[in-house]
A protein has these predicted regions:
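Bacterial N-terminal signal peptides that target proteins for export
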Residues: 1-8
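C-terminal motif of bacterial Sec signal peptides marking the signal peptidase cleavage site
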Residues: 18-22
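N-terminal targeting/tethering segments
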Residues: 24-141
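PPIase-associated folding chaperone regions across multiple families
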Residues: 25, 134-213, 217, 291-389
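Hydrophobic/aromatic residues in well-formed alpha-helices
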Residues: 42, 118-121, 146, 177, ...
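Sec/Tat-exported extracytoplasmic proteins
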Residues: 46-49, 53, 96, 100, ...
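Peptidyl-prolyl cis-trans isomerase
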Residues: 206-321, 329-341
Length: 389
């Protein structure tokens, strides 16, 4: 009996030791279908989540672009209802789970990385590590974790293309991608006729009517068949002349020493004697606007997309300007399509791909290491500005 008790006691001690060891193991963050994702990958995704949070904040306040550019902290801000650290953790955990889904899809589809792919991965890993190794090591990200993330990203691209590239599982055609360009981008030439200095100012009806009449005269000439580029140049010359006249009516101010301002135009022009002939722009005066653009104004962009058809010219008015807008076929700009085709493909099917990954994930067993989640705080994944260290 005593022997049995001793054996049971030993087994209990071993079991407790195993349990404590398992609970204390923070080398991994999540297991999906038994496949383990290291904590270093999670921490790396936290840093990516911080950048993503910055872009989310900048979408409503452009000042956050400067925060990111100059390394200013925005950890104390909120993205929607989440604090930035909460956003980072959720982002990192989601990406860690998706990591495994991508790996499994890559294998299921029988995809492979080419030798060129592997060389590019090596280059990217070494470049990222060599430039940031000290910071990565400080926050707990090893070079192997960097390699895993970059390799997984390359695999994700191949999985995406297997589904959504032309000839892939989805049945995408080249016309589908071109339709995205046509639906989301507009190609225009336009002239601006200002009638107010600020949207907050009371409208000067006389000034507004003069701008409207001027704009209408140019629109009439376009509709009569005159060349748009020639009219734009004419209008710009009028604007320049008006600005020059306005400058000339200002009084000459003396220098700080009381003397007249020196005319250095001759000296200034000396450096401009050598002229370099630039190649002619095949698409002069053209602007390409995305449907999400807010400049020159949201009213302008919305009107261009909803009220002006390709081949038409119309007047557009916002709070401070009247515009003469001529809309052209964006698909005729083959250079835009060729240079941005891959980006259009991703934009077209990004949500579909995310849904595909999430649907796969729902059918998998997922185990989250709460000990690792508690240990690896989002704040520690962000390099603090020098004055905060």
């Amino acid at each position: 009996m005593n022997t049995i008790k001793k054996i049971v006691a030993v087994l209990m001690v071993v079991a407790m030791a195993f349990t404590l060891t398992a609970c204390g193991d923070t080398s991994w963050i999540v297991k999906v279908e038994g496949e383990t994702v290291p904590s270093g990958v999670y921490i790396y995704y936290q840093t990516v989540g911080y950048t993503s949070a910055g872009y989310e904040l900048a979408a409503t306040d452009a000042n956050y672009y400067y925060y990111m550019m100059y390394g200013m902290s925005y950890l104390d801000q909120k993205v929607g209802e989440k604090t930035v650290p909460e956003y980072m953790n959720d982002y990192a955990l989601s990406m860690s789970k998706q990591y495994v889904v991508v790996e499994r899809l890559f294998d299921e589809l029988g995809l492979e990385l080419t030798e060129d792919d592997k060389k590019l991965i090596d280059t990217q890993v070494n470049s990222l590590w060599n430039g940031n190794s000290e910071q990565f090591e400080k926050i707990g990200v090893g070079k192997e974790s960097i390699r895993k993330v970059i390799t997984n990203s390359a695999k994700e691209e191949k999985v995406f293309n297997a589904y959504y590239e032309v000839g892939g599982i989805n049945g995408t055609t080249e016309d589908d991608i071109k339709a995205y360009l046509e639906d989301n981008y507009a190609r225009v030439k336009y002239m601006t006729f200002n009638y107010a200095d600020s949207a907050d100012d009371a409208v000067d009806e006389t000034r507004k009517n003069e701008a409207l009449a001027d704009a209408q005269s140019y629109l009439d000439r376009i509709l009569a068949g005159e060349d748009v580029d020639t009219l734009i140049e004419e209008h710009q010359a009028e604007v320049n002349a008006a600005n020059e006249e306005s400058e000339n009516t200002k009084p000459d101010l003396p220098d700080a020493d009381g003397g007249e301002a020196e005319d250095n135009s001759a000296e200034d022009g000396a450096a401009d004697d050598v002229e370099v002939e630039e190649p002619a722009n095949p698409y002069p005066n053209e602007s390409i606007f995305s449907k999400e653009a807010t400049s020159p104004s949201e009213k302008f962009v919305n009107y261009v997309f909803t009220e002006i058809k390709v081949g038409e010219a119309k007047l557009v008015q916002d709070d401070i300007n009247i515009y003469v807008v001529s809309k052209m076929d964006v698909l005729e700009r083959t250079d835009i399509y060729e240079q941005n085709r891959d980006s259009f493909l991703v934009a077209l099917f990004d949500k579909d791909f995310t849904s595909l990954v999430n649907e796969r994930l729902e059918g998998y067993s997922v185990e989250v290491n709460e000990g690792s989640v508690k240990r690896y705080k989002a704040e520690n994944a962000v390099e603090k500005p020098s004055e905060e260290q």
